[in-house]
Amino acid sequence: MTTNEQKKRIYLSSPHMSAEGYEKAFIEEAFATNWIAPLGPNVDSFERELAERVGVKAAVALSSGTAAIHLALKAVGVGQGDIVFCQDLTFSATANPIRYQGAIPVFIDSDHTWNMCPKTLKKAFEKYEAMGQKPKAVIVVHLYGLSADLDAIMEICREYDVPLIEDAAESLGSLYKGKQTGTFGDLGVFSFNGNKIITTSGGGMLVSNDEEKIKKARYWATQAREPVRYYEHKDLGFNYRMSNICAGIGRGQLRVLDERIAKKKYIFDYYKEHLSDLEGLEMMPIQDYDDPNCWLSCIILSTDRVKPTDIIEALEAENIESRPIWKPMHLQPYYQNCDFITLQEQGSVSEDIFNRGLCLPSDTKMTDEDLAKVTMVIRGLWG
């Protein structure tokens, strides 16, 4: 066994089941009643409970957040050859469903919020309007739980009469001006992947106040099967429904969401208190309008003395997990030929954040001793 393997592993963000065993109780109920299927009481209840929690009229539980984005795009009519304006600084799962629909992504740079820049979004609309084109949808992301500047973005979308889809995969529990992110746009998306603030092991949820769109998404997610005795399909469907077992985990996790948010915020505040005095190190930006869930605590460096890779390697040597900021979509080889809109004459805001940023371990099972170890390793690089 190596020295590194003997050290306690500190994770970036791993699954955290409730101490009360809520998840296990719902799973055992599913086994006892033989609801081992991609439908059932847990699925129905999870949809209702999540909708009530975030304050929307309807929700559909799906196999992933990616599936939810896909069906959101389909629900607003995105199809072959359509243009979709998409936040550049994000994980690829935000953009990939655009291609599933045969549509064309145009990537929009970030601003000081780390999220989509409204001025750049406006520039994109003006550019494509001059070419006689208009996007079929806009996808905004609430990166790492930080709310995007929704008022400004929604105003632009209303001006051009284009639907807004919120990728709130990372921001369940984040509030924009007191209201849950993911509930402002035409449709919102949440993810319950294993590293998210609550998990179903894998899964997602599509939410909206447009009950017809959610009804249609549920139909597509169930192989677009018609409500007749025999198997009939008038539309292309998908196998996207969430398992009743996974939904049981989600129901249990939802009961400890407030605890998880509180711990994530505690971790962020701990890092802020113990690292902010280091020259050239800043915590991720929180705006006045924002009450983030702090899913991941991120930093950005403005010093030549220490690079993000130095911190990653130093933490790795102590068996501590960290990772770079998402690599922007316009820098991804698959998307290199797509249009990218920025206000910068050279480079971009998203690329700068990627080059200088870093995600610190933000696991809700971390102890104060773990946090002290992380900060000690980082401070050691400053000498």
Regions inferred by a protein language model and the residue ranges of each:
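Hydrophobic/aromatic ligand-binding patch that stacks against planar heteroaromatic rings
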Residues: 96-98, 156, 197, 245
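Conserved PLP-binding active-site segment in aminotransferase class I/II-type PLP enzymes
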Residues: 1-75, 79, 140, 158, ...
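PLP-dependent aminotransferase class I/II
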Residues: 2-3, 41-48, 56-59, 119, ...
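Active-site phosphate-binding strand-loop segment of PLP-dependent enzymes
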Residues: 113-200, 205-207, 212, 307
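Conserved PLP-anchoring active-site segment centered on the Schiff-base-forming lysine
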Residues: 70-124
